[in-house]
Amino acid sequence: GAPGLEITLAGPTLKFNTAAVIALTGAEIPATLDGLPIPMWQPIPIKAGATLKIGTVSGAGARAYLAVRGGFDVPLYLGSASTFTLGKFGGHGGRVLMPGDILHIAGSYAAAPPAITGPAPLATPLRPAMAHRWDIGVLYGPHGAPDFFTPE
């Protein structure tokens, strides 16, 4: 897949300097495009100059995802576009995004073929169920650094 943004609990406000197509998925999160609410789970065309404001996750889940046609143009590290902030590599300079950062969209929106049909939402039965209770396994790995876990 193409690099996108993982949004934990609260989202950013993004100004698009070029036309794009986005989709917002994952945990339920309100979003507006130039002040008008937009739905999740479907392609949304964005005009150059538009402002996308992503709110705070509500309900089950902690993460939402913003996909952009073509993906974000970030360097790959070991084949991944993910950011690892503790290691200071990957993603956008190996750090969290800050106000004023500019993310470039990879590929060319203009070169993308026209859609055969209009944007269609992902059918509800195909969307993942968001549970309020999770059983998870934990394995020691790079995130096992003292910054994340202590013996207590």
Show the residue positions of the predicted features:
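Conserved "landmark" site that anchors the functional core of diverse proteins
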Residues: 1-152
